[in-house]
Structure formats: structure tokens, C-alpha cells
Swiss-Prot record:
The gene is tgt. It comes from Streptococcus pyogenes serotype M49 (strain NZ131). The lineage of its organism: Bacteria, Bacillati, Bacillota, Bacilli, Lactobacillales. It is an enzyme of class 2 (transferase). It catalyses: 7-aminomethyl-7-carbaguanine + guanosine(34) in tRNA = 7-aminomethyl-7-carbaguanosine(34) in tRNA + guanine. This is Queuine tRNA-ribosyltransferase. Binds 1 zinc ion per subunit. Belongs to the queuine tRNA-ribosyltransferase family. Keywords: Glycosyltransferase, Metal-binding, Queuosine biosynthesis, Transferase, tRNA processing, Zinc. It holds the Pfam family TGT.
């Protein structure tokens, strides 16, 4: 049996769904699942210190290979002692492959069998990223969990294009495995692609499962498709993945999508959503989204969320936070970011308890009704 640096332990499966309660063991510690992972694009979760992230309960954070490769450089980070030491974070870190950023940020990209040539979005210089280079960068960063280099086709691309794309992604995954210098202390995940085509998702999953990765990611979702389309893809994709390994849904952070992903057997999620919307004054609360910048909160001396026990809600009022944001004070963004991150990490804590209690569907319905989705009659 292969001795993986990343191990998944299943504790319980919810009676009425495919939801899994478990934990993932890494070289930098163990975290419970299902788990939402805050995104630290530039080796920092925007405005939050490592101590604050630990107080929130973030058992693992994500950093972006593409951005750190361009600035300050993966070799510099390696010389500093690796990403954990560089950013003073002693818990697990996951890095993406850089692929999504190449396709979404870079200009004039050209995809070939060898890799992707593109223009650096910072200075316009010509860059080349291959499966081997993506692995080399992540080996230098020293993350606990790494991603294979993949192509992330748009959800509505033609069938023939997506078929060629997933076949190339499978070949790239094999090349990445061979290039991996640190399989003893960094777990490399394969990424299942295939847009909305069930047979292509099956083909992609079969290819990657045969390569025996320590874990598997589901990519190519949350890229413009409907919530129902995402759920349909998860319905036929997660059962294709090994039960004894982690399952990671990339780029998903809306509360309803988190719960619906868990119902379909997903263990890990990440998204920039909580910090991105926080910078505009949008806060997630138990009763839905609240835009605290709005004038009606100018004299509202209550917390952002009456049911939240985070640092922000225990100490500051809507009126004060609105004042900070209107005055362009960074502390306001710190407070809203802290609250939103806490909200999603704590939501996953409640979801884990609901799995333990075998009442996840009831929890979902109650949450959606309170949050204001009015979607409690969705098909599961």
C-alpha cells in the first residue's frame, strides 16, 4: 500500500445523503472535514494575520502558485525556508497549479501539448508554464497539498474541444507525477475536468484514479454555470472518486453551494468570495447578505449578525463598521473580512455537526430559508 503524505480518515457518512464527516492528516497537522479554506492569494489572506485565521478556526489555507511564481518568486520563497516559514503559518497549506489564473488573468495565451505560453499580467513579458514547471514551483513553495497542472475549459465549450482538453489534462497529470520531487512530504492531487459532459467527467476521473493520486479535485465548476448544473455534475462525478481519499471542489464559496457540495460527498472547498465581498461592505449573516455601507445602518448599533459570536460581532456595531468603510479605513475591511471568513468556517462546523446528527437535509432547508434563498424545494 502506498504511504501517502496526505491521508483521509472517514469518521461517518450521513444516513440520508452522501455527506462525509472526516479528517485529513498532513505533514503540518490534521484538519476536520468538510472544511472551507480561506484563500491567501499572495501568501496572505487579505487583511488577516495568521493568529486571526487560527482564531477563526481555519485549519488550512490556500495560496496561489501563479501569483507567487511571478512575485516574489518560488526560488526566493524556497530560500526563506518554504511558504510556511515565509508567511509564519505552521498549519496545512494547499497550493493550486496556476492553471486557472493563466486562463483567467493572462493575455494572449497559447495552449500546446508542452504547456501554455502567455503574457505576464503584471508587466506583459512572455511566460511559459508546463506541467513540470507547475510542480517545480509548488515543490519550492513546500505546500502540504499540491495540484496537477490542468486546463480549465469554459463550461459551455463544444464537446470535441472539451474531450481533447481532458485528454491533454490527463497526459499533463502523468507528467506532473513523474516530475514531483517531494512525494514523501507533499501530496499531489489530480484534477477531474470535463465541463458538463458526464461521459467526459467519467473518462477524466478514470484516467486520474488509475494514476493513484493521494487526493482528487473537481475543477471546471463555479465558472458561470447555474447552481443546478453544478449540482448535476457533482451528482455524477463524486461517486467516481475513491472513498478513502479527499475530494476537493475548487473555487466554490457561496453558502448554498457549500452545503450542496457536502451533500454530494465533497470534503474541501475554497473561494475568494468572503474577503472579496467584505471589501465592498457585503457581509454574510444568518439571515442573508447585509450591505453594511447602506445608509440605513448609519445609526444601527447592533452587531452585523445577532447569532454570530465572532470577534467582530462581539465588539463592534453596524454603525461603527459602516463609518470605517465610508472613511476608507482599513480596519473596517479587516472587521468585515474576519466576520465573513468566520461565518463560512463556522457554517462548515455546523454542517459537520449536522452530519453527526444525521439531519443535514433539515439543516439545509432551515439555513436556506433563514438566509433568504427561497430555494428549499431544490432537487438534491
Amino acid at each position: 500500500m502506498t504511504d501517502y503524505p496526505i491521508k483521509y480518515r472517514l469518521i461517518k457518512t450521513e444516513k440520508h445523503t452522501g455527506a462525509r464527516l472526516g479528517e485529513i492528516i498532513t505533514p503540518h497537522g490534521t484538519f476536520p472535514t468538510p472544511m472551507f479554506m480561506p484563500v491567501g492569494t499572495q501568501a496572505t489572506v487579505k487583511t488577516q494575520s495568521p493568529e486571526e485565521l487560527k482564531a477563526i478556526g481555519s485549519g488550512i489555507i490556500l495560496s496561489n502558485t501563479y501569483h507567487l511564481w511571478l512575485r516574489p518568486g518560488d526560488e526566493l520563497i524556497a530560500r526563506s525556508g518554504g511558504l510556511h516559514k515565509f508567511m509564519n503559518w505552521d498549519q496545512p497549506i494547499l497550493t493550486d497549479s496556476g492553471g486557472f489564473q493563466v486562463y483567467s488573468l493572462a493575455d494572449s495565451r497559447n495552449i500546446t501539448e508542452e504547456g501554455v505560453t502567455f503574457k505576464n499580467h503584471l508587466n506583459g513579458s512572455k511566460m511559459f508554464l508546463s506541467p513540470e514547471k507547475a510542480i517545480s514551483i509548488q515543490n519550492n513553495l513546500g505546500s502540504d497539498i499540491m495540484m496537477s497542472f490542468d486546463e480549465c475549459p469554459q463550461f459551455y465549450q463544444p464537446y470535441d474541444y472539451v474531450k481533447k482538453s481532458i485528454e491533454r489534462t490527463s497526459r499533463w497529470a502523468e507528467r506532473g507525477l513523474k516530475a514531483h520531487r517531494r512525494p514523501h512530504d507533499q501530496g499531489l492531487f489530480g484534477i477531474v475536468q470535463g465541463a458538463g459532459f458526464e461521459d467526459l467527467r467519467r473518462q477524466s476521473a478514470a484516467d486520474l484514479v488509475a494514476m493513484d493520486f493521494p487526493g482528487y479535485s473537481i475543477g471546471g465548476l463555479a465558472v458561470g454555470e447555474s447552481h443546478e448544473e453544478m449540482n448535476a455534475v457533482l451528482d455524477f462525478t463524486t461517486p467516481l472518486l475513491p472513498e478513502n481519499k479527499p475530494r476537493y471542489l475548487m473555487g466554490v464559496g457561496a453558502p448554498d453551494s457549500l452545503i450542496d457540495g457536502v451533500i454530494r460527498g465533497v470534503d474541501m472547498f475554497d473561494c475568494v468570495l468572503p474577503t472579496r465581498i467584505a471589501r465592498n461592505g457585503t457581509c454574510m449573516t444568518s439571515e442573508g447578505r447585509l450591505v453594511v455601507k447602506n445608509a440605513k445602518f448609519a445609526e444601527d448599533f447592533t452587531p452585523l449578525d445577532h447569532d454570530c459570536d465572532c470577534y467582530t460581532c462581539q465588539n463592534y456595531s453596524r454603525a461603527y463598521i459602516r463609518h470605517l468603510l465610508k472613511a476608507d479605513e482599513t480596519f473596517g475591511i479587516r472587521l468585515t473580512s474576519y466576520h465573513n471568513l468566520y461565518f463560512l468556517v463556522n457554517l462548515m462546523k455546523k454542517v459537520r455537526q449536522a452530519i453527526m446528527d444525521d439531519n443535514l437535509l433539515e439543516f439545509r432547508q432551515d439555513f436556506l430559508e433563514r438566509y433568504g434563498y427561497n430555494k428549499s424545494n431544490r432537487n438534491f
